[in-house]
């Protein structure tokens, strides 16, 4: 008989995030009342964060295979073949709730967790990126959260030794009570030496590796599956504490152990800690698992079985080991100064059995913990399709130059230098394009190849039209990779939404998934990994739908990359793609015209046009016929032009030939467009090649000087533009330091 001295009450069930019908399902599965430890295990395995019970139905509709895909969703990270016997392993994951409660530690451990997902599979991490969403700048907590999150990411990544080379930062009132911290990591491995979490073999030792177990992070996964209320500050003890130096030791020890041939299966201890890692390893291999918690290294006295099973202490791994190499494995971990303990074994009875002080504290059917988790087909309401906005209905500014300067200094448009200068983006010595461009690029050691990385989503588009917003997030990633000369390979998604029990929120989720799927199929851009973060609500108010997309591309030769910077004076500037002046959901409409409650349609995404235009631009880059390339997104043509000018320190003169209102031409956010420069004597041939391919190509102007001039009007000094662009974020953060 399993001892159970805690009465399981409806209140206790609710505290564990379980619904009454879910608890009844537990009773039906095990035929008795669970112990407290067993209740905690079910709570961890059946919460939204671990089971994907609200999203699984829709995630299955995404395309996940392709000629280069070695491993798609279901493992710690996705694996994609990059040729020459090498693979890139990558994933993006959220750490939203912890980062709001304790910004520094929440963000730091988000980085640590995603790095473990990558090196658990045998890869050495080579790049990190992050997508950050904060509340309104005038909200009293925003500065504190920005400061803590950025310091946490920088402190962990810099100490661990991985370059943080790109990302996104946005501000919006919908994130006032729920910031988003989405961390991306990628690593390189030999394609034939990938390590998986599926346990194989009966009676094999299960080994605990890494840091000791403490009480930090207990119920972290459960917290990530619920919305916040007034008392969210009280959840601080559920935030994990990270140590990047221990993680670096764990990385080196794991890679050395993998090279020894001792590892049969490996899983990092992330959400739900020892519970989730042990269950996943056993269930995937159709094996049972027996653990003796007396053998788990602990850093705190008197820990109960419940606490040990649900702790989310960081920098820990679980491994199934070849018994013949047990001593060799232990020697490696002793060498690196890390805890190594055999805490259990695999069994053939498909039970998940936990012992503490000689007593059985849990004895559950291991497959049911995952396979029998509830799966919901939640009701959803399709959003009303918004109407396109007539650009002539949007007021024109008196002075376009002044508006450009204003736009470049907006919180959502200003330089992120204050953020990325706190990250070491050059460590490892392989960064070819760092933060500030369309995509970051690193050199791949052992050859000429390069890898490109980008993160993108436009939440205001997703709120207005989820399907178009989902398509646009993928398409912009595809454009950003293309703009540096990379072949887009695959994506990872990080789907951040509000409460899925609300049909309108579930409708947003479904629409975005449909749009992501549309784009991935049309662009041959499979989804190989991802994460879902739901219940991003505070006091019933949800965030904007934010399906962040991380993408990876391949350059055959990293020397062929291009950047957004103008390279020389006197070069031709050519616009690729059609401009229709779409101002619906634009930065201009929201922040300049003041239409913050705009209900118009975002710019539509024509995926066939995206592919055609992008393939042409990439071919021109690879042929060496371009000197600078920039995709056009937030803010439109004029903002993209200013960004190219600032990056190169060279001005430009442009004369658009358009029947559109000038502000719609300048600030419209039509998709599938690029600005491209080339030597003057090659411009006619470039345009002729584009026209032959059926692609709109328009000569806009010429680079030169230290000003931007539109239609021969009053020139705008680059110095003034740059001051506005670079000034807002440092001034905003400095103002907080003075308070």
UniProtKB/Swiss-Prot annotation:
ATP binds at residues 52, 91, 493, 530. Gene3D superfamilies: PurM-like C-terminal domain, PurM-like, N-terminal domain. The lineage of its organism: Bacteria, Pseudomonadati, Pseudomonadota, Alphaproteobacteria, Hyphomicrobiales. Its EC number is 6.3.5.3. This is Phosphoribosylformylglycinamidine synthase subunit PurL. It holds the Pfam family AIRS. It is found in: Cytoplasm. Keywords: ATP-binding, Cytoplasm, Ligase, Magnesium, Metal-binding, Nucleotide-binding, Purine biosynthesis.
């Amino acid at each position: 008989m399993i001892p159970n001295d805690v009465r399981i009450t409806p209140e206790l069930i609710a505290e564990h995030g379980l619904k009454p019908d879910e608890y009844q399902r537990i009773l039906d599965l095990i035929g008795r009342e669970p112990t407290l430890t067993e209740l905690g295990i079910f709570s961890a395995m059946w919460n939204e964060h671990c089971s994907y019970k609200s999203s699984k139905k829709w995630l299955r509709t995404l395309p996940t295979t392709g000629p280069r895909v070695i491993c798609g969703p279901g493992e710690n990270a996705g694996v994609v073949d990059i040729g020459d016997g090498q693979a890139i392993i990558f994933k993006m994951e959220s750490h939203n709730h912890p980062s709001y409660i304790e910004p520094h530690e929440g963000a730091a451990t988000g980085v640590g967790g995603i790095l473990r997902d990558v090196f658990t599979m045998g890869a050495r991490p080579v790049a990190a990126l992050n997508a950050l969403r904060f509340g309104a700048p005038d909200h009293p907590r925003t500065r504190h959260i920005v400061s803590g999150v950025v310091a946490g990411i920088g402190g962990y990544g810099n100490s661990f030794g991985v370059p943080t080379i790109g990302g996104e930062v946005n501000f919006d009132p919908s994130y006032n009570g729920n910031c988003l911290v989405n961390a991306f990591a990628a690593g390189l491995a030999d394609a034939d030496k990938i390590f998986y979490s599926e346990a194989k073999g009966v009676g094999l030792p299960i080994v605990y590796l890494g840091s000791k177990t403490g009480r930090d992070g207990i119920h972290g996964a459960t917290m990530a599956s619920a919305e916040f209320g007034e008392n969210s500050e009280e959840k601080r003890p559920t935030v994990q504490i990270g140590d990047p130096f221990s993680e670096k030791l764990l990385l080196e020890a794991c890679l050395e152990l993998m090279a020894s041939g001792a590892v049969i299966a490996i899983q990092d201890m992330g959400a739900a800690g020892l519970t989730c890692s042990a269950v996943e390893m056993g269930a995937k291999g159709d094996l049972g698992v027996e653990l003796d918690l007396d053998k788990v290294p602990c850093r705190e006295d008197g820990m109960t079985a419940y606490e040990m099973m649900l702790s989310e202490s960081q920098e820990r791994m679980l491994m199934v080991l070849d018994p013949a190499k047990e001593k060799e494995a232990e020697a490696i971990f002793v060498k690196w100064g890390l805890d190594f303990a055999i805490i259990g074994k695999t069994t053939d009875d498909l039970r998940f059995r936990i012992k503490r002080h000689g007593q059985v504290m849990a004895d559950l059917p291991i497959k049911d913990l995952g396979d029998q988790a509830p799966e919901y087909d939640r009701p959803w309401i399709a959003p009303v399709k918004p109407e396109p906005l007539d650009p002539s209905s949007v007021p024109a500014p008196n002075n376009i130059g002044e508006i450009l300067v204003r736009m470049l200094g907006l919180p959502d448009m200003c330089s992120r230098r204050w953020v990325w200068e706190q990250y070491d983006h050059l460590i490892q010595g392989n960064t070819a394009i760092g933060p500030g461009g369309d995509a970051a690029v690193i050199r791949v050691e052992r050859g000429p190849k390069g890898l490109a990385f980008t993160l993108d989503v436009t939440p205001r588009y997703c709120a207005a039209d989820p399907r178009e917003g989902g398509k646009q997030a993928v398409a912009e990633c595809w454009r950003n990779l293309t703009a540096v000369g990379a072949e887009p390979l695959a994506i990872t998604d990080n789907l951040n939404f509000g409460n899925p029990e609300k049909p309108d929120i579930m409708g947003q989720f479904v629409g975005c998934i449909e749009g992501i799927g549309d784009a991935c199929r049309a662009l041959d851009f499979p989804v190989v990994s991802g994460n879902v973060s739901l219940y991003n609500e505070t006091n019933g108010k949800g965030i904007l739908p934010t399906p962040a997309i991380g993408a990876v591309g391949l350059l055959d030769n990293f020397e062929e990359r291009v950047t957004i910077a103008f390279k020389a004076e006197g070069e031709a500037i050519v616009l690729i793609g059609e401009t229709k002046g779409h101002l619906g959901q634009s930065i201009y409409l929201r922040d300049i015209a003041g239409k913050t409650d705009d209900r118009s349609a975002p710019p539509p995404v024509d995926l066939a046009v995206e592919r055609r235009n992008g393939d042409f631009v990439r071919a021109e880059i690879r042929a060496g016929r371009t000197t600078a390339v920039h995709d056009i997104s937030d803010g439109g043509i004029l903002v993209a032009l200013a960004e190219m000018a600032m990056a190169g320190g060279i001005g430009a003169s442009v004369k658009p030939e358009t029947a559109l209102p000038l502000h719609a031409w300048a600030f419209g956010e039509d998709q599938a467009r690029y600005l491209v420069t080339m030597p003057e004597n090659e411009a006619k041939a470039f345009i002729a090649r584009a026209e032959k391919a059926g692609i709109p190509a328009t000569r806009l102007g010429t680079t030169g000087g230290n000003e931007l001039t539109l239609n021969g009007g009053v020139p705008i000094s680059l110095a003034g533009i740059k001051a506005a662009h670079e000034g807002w974020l440092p001034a905003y953060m400095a103002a907080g330091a003075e308070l």
